[in-house]
């Protein structure tokens, strides 16, 4: 069966669905010009991932911060990073009452910028900073990101980007929110993720066990494709999602 026929099938499933959940990974952001962390052209091919270990950040703060600022903030400030058509379709489906939430492994805030209001950020969000001492959070744009990491205006404590460093746990609200979303949906759309990062990679299986139809959009087969996926669509989500949307009944 070719992609065109499978797109029609996906559109039929999603048209009938009462509760769609999107599950996005690095491939979604790559279409907006953000390089992945792993694989060919990945960030960790150029930088030591230990720089994002939480213990390393505490023990070698200045060294760690230099890399964090360069990778996550200098890069983004020099690029015109914005939501791509795939992001926009997920936001459109929420507005139409079809999609209840997006579960994302990405930290770039693009789903919120696109217009989704219920986003479970499994790995946090780089657009915020959090105090490691008192937990106070601020918008990254309100800070001056100099050669020293920012300090908390409330208590003077060391701040860090509000995404998950190696050695930190998944935020409870994001984890339990993702589990509930997967349990309650009847259609689950996997987009741009290989399924290799734990524990996020367990979420699609929860949806499958609870009866959801699994639609997968990836550039190549993933760990899900031969095990839980009902319809596999190979290609860019920024092209496939609009094609599905155009065929959905309203």
Tell what function each PLM region has.
Residues 1-250:
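Conserved catalytic core of sirtuin-type NAD+-dependent deacylases
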